[in-house]
Amino acid sequence: MNPLYLASGSPRRRELLTQIGVPFTAISADIDETPLADESPAAYVERLARGKAAAGRGLITSSESQAPACVLGADTAVVLDGRILGKPLDQADALQMLMALSGREHEVFTAIALLDGERCESRVVRSLVRFRPISPAEAALYWASGEPCDKAGGYAIQGLAAVFVAGLNGSYSAVVGLPVCETAELLGHFGIPCWQNLPVR
């Protein structure tokens, strides 16, 4: 079986991949995440997921892997009114994002890409998240927690921001950062089964 590498520094993605029982090695693959002119959110996250997988594959030396390695890349974007909300630059940016999301529905696009050196397959998952109204005081308190700093859209659905979520249509795990169902399907296409750590009965 081909060894699997996760080209991501995200603890959330590592947890989700561990959850489906797939052994992997995490590597960091930094790429330029600047959106291209007139690039749709779906095309943007797919390009970045593929780029991260390719960058990760470039970091693996032949001595590290006797079998051809598979590299999984992923990217998530929060989108409001067609505009991609990245990671907040500072407190003012984070508070502005939270107040813009307050009481409204927004889109979350997450892409995954799996590359083995010969082929690359990818998937894009779109989810809708609806926030209840958020007061400026709540937004400031949430910022002070430190949680929004490195999150797309300035919030973590699996963390303290769960109290803001009034509804979700789509994949919860995709909003967190890795669509588990689609990831398992893609891994299967490359001969990597899930639940490898289950005890034999």
UniProtKB/Swiss-Prot annotation:
Pfam families with a match to the protein in the record: Maf (PF02545)
CDD domains for this protein: Maf
EC nos: 3.6.1.9
Annotated site (Important for substrate specificity): R12, T76, Q158
Enzyme class: hydrolase
Record field: catalytic activity: dTTP + H2O = dTMP + diphosphate + H(+); UTP + H2O = UMP + diphosphate + H(+)
Entry GO terms, CC: cytoplasm
Places the protein is found: Cytoplasm
Cofactor(s), by name: a divalent metal cation
Primary location group: cytoplasm
Enzyme active site: D75
Alphabetical keyword list: Cytoplasm, Hydrolase, Nucleotide metabolism
GO process terms (BP): nucleotide metabolic process
GO molecular function: dTTP diphosphatase activity; UTP diphosphatase activity
Entry's family note: Belongs to the Maf family. YhdE subfamily.
Function: Nucleoside triphosphate pyrophosphatase that hydrolyzes dTTP and UTP. May have a dual role in cell division arrest and in preventing the incorporation of modified nucleotides into cellular nucleic acids.
Protein name (Swiss-Prot/TrEMBL): dTTP/UTP pyrophosphatase
Source species of the chain: Pseudomonas fluorescens (strain ATCC BAA-477 / NRRL B-23932 / Pf-5)
